[in-house]
A protein has these predicted regions:
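Active-site environment of non-heme Fe oxygenases that use a 2-His-1-carboxylate facial triad
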Residues: 88-90, 94-141, 146-377
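Motif-centric detector for short Cys/His coordination patterns
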Residues: 1-125
C-alpha cells in the first residue's frame, strides 16, 4: 500500500486516490509535543534543522492515521488521515481558508442593490455580522443604517469587529461643513467635487477598510459616489493589456503630510499578488506626486494613467447615492474608490466621522464567526 521512494512516499488516500507526500514536508509538519507546542500549536521544530537525508525507517497506514519512524533519531510522527486529506498538495489541494474572498465585480447596476444592514442587528446577531463582513469582503461596499448619532460611535463600531487602524489622521477624523464657516485643509474639506479615489495610498500598507459615519448630512448636493476598482482593472486588462502591465509595474509616488507626520510611498497603482492576481488598487490623483520615471517610460505611463482615469469617470462604472444622517458607509479601501459630488455649504450642515480598520481583521472575524458556527477551532 505504501511506496517509499528517495524523497517521498506514495499512499492511497480516499477519495483522492494515490497521492504523495515529501519526507521533508512530513517531518516539518509533525504535530507531536516535541515538534509543536501542545497549547499554542505553534511549531517548535526548526525547519532548517531537518537533515537533507531525512527518510522513514518504518511507515504504516492505520485505520485513522499514517505513522512514520524517521531516520533522524528514530523520531516517531503520526498524521491523521483526515489531516493529510485536508493538506494533500499533490492532487489539486482544496481551498481551506473559509475567509478567502469571493470577489463579485460590479458597475452601475449596484446602485439599486447596495448591501444594507441595520446597526443594532449587527450588534445582536452574529449571522448578520457574518453576512456584513462577507459583503465587505466580496463586494467592497456596504451601508450600515440607523447608527446612533453620537460622536465617536464609528470607533466603537469598529471595535465590535476588530481594532481601529491608526493613521496620520489618528483613530478618528472629523470632516465638517457648517454654513458661514470655511476651513479647507484638503480637497475633502472643500465643497468641490471629490473625484473617486482610495484613501491613504501614501502608505505602503494602506488601511483596508474605511468607515464614514454621517452624523449630519443636511446640505444640498454631496451625494456619495463609488467605483469598483477591480472591475475597472479587469476591463482595462481585456481592453489594453499593455496599459494594465504599465500600471502594474510603474511606481507612483504618493505623499500626505501634516503637523502629525509626513507619510510617503512609491508603489504601482495596480499591485499584484504572487499568482499575478490584483489585490490592491491605489488611486488618488490629488495625492500623487510628480512622476519620477525614465524619459522612455513617461509617455506610455501617462497614456495608461489617463486611460485608467477616464474609465474611472465612465458612468457605467460609477454609482451615486445619498447617505442619510445615521448611515455608515463602509468600503474595501484596497479595491473600491469613493468620492462625492459638490455641495452647497450654505444650505445645511455636514459632519462625518471617519475611521479605519485593516482588511485582514475583517477576514479574521469571518474565520472566527465561521468557527463558532461549526464548533471548530
Amino acid at each position: 500500500m505504501l511506496n517509499l521512494s528517495e524523497q517521498w512516499l506514495e499512499m492511497p488516500l480516499a477519495p483522492h486516490g494515490t497521492t504523495r507526500f515529501h519526507y521533508v514536508w512530513l517531518r516539518d509538519n509533525c504535530h507531536c509535543s516535541e515538534c509543536r507546542h501542545p497549547d499554542t500549536k505553534e511549531r517548535i521544530l526548526a525547519t532548517a534543522s531537518i537533515p537533507t537525508t531525512i527518510a522513514p525507517t518504518q511507515a504504516e497506514i492505520g485505520e485513522t492515521a499514517l505513522t512514520v519512524v524517521w531516520n533522524d533519531q528514530q523520531h516517531v510522527s503520526e498524521y491523521p488521515l483526515q489531516w493529510l486529506l485536508a493538506h494533500d498538495y499533490a492532487t489539486a489541494p482544496p481551498e481551506t481558508d473559509v475567509a478567502k474572498p469571493k470577489v463579485k465585480l460590479w458597475g452601475r447596476e449596484l446602485q439599486a442593490e447596495i448591501p444594507r444592514f441595520d446597526y443594532q442587528t449587527l450588534h445582536s446577531d452574529e449571522s448578520a455580522m457574518l453576512a456584513w463582513c462577507e459583503a465587505v469582503r466580496d463586494i467592497g461596499l456596504t451601508v450600515v443604517e440607523n447608527a446612533p448619532l453620537v460622536e465617536g460611535e464609528i470607533e466603537r463600531f469598529a471595535e465590535t469587529v476588530a481594532v481601529v487602524r491608526e493613521t496620520i489622521y489618528d483613530r478618528l477624523h472629523n470632516v465638517r461643513a457648517t454654513p458661514g464657516e470655511y476651513n479647507a485643509y484638503n480637497v475633502a474639506s472643500t465643497t468641490l467635487e471629490l473625484k473617486p479615489h482610495t484613501d491613504m495610498p501614501n502608505y505602503n500598507n494602506p488601511p483596508g477598510v474605511q468607515m464614514f459615519h454621517f452624523l449630519v448630512n443636511e446640505s444640498e448636493g454631496g451625494e456619495s459616489t463609488a467605483v469598483d476598482g477591480f472591475k475597472v482593472a479587469a476591463d482595462l486588462l481585456a481592453r489594453d493589456p499593455q496599459a494594465y502591465q504599465t500600471l502594474a509595474t510603474t511606481p507612483v509616488e504618493f505623499r500626505m503630510f501634516s503637523s502629525r507626520g509626513d507619510i510617503q510611498s512609491s508603489n504601482p497603482l495596480l499591485t499584484l499578488d504572487h499568482s499575478g492576481e490584483l489585490n490592491v488598487f491605489r488611486f488618488s490623483n490629488q495625492l500623487a506626486q510628480p512622476a519620477r520615471i525614465s524619459a522612455e517610460q513617461m509617455s506610455e505611463f501617462y497614456r495608461a494613467y489617463q486611460l485608467l482615469g477616464q474609465m474611472i469617470e465612465d458612468p457605467s462604472y460609477k454609482i451615486e447615492f445619498r447617505m442619510k444622517t445615521g448611515d455608515i458607509m463602509v468600503t474595501n479601501n484596497l479595491r473600491v474608490l469613493h468620492g462625492r459630488n459638490s455641495y452647497d455649504a450654505n444650505s445645511g450642515a455636514r459632519h462625518l466621522q471617519l475611521s479605519y480598520m485593516d482588511f485582514d481583521d475583517v477576514l479574521s472575524r469571518i474565520r472566527m464567526l465561521k468557527q463558532a458556527q461549526s464548533g471548530a477551532s
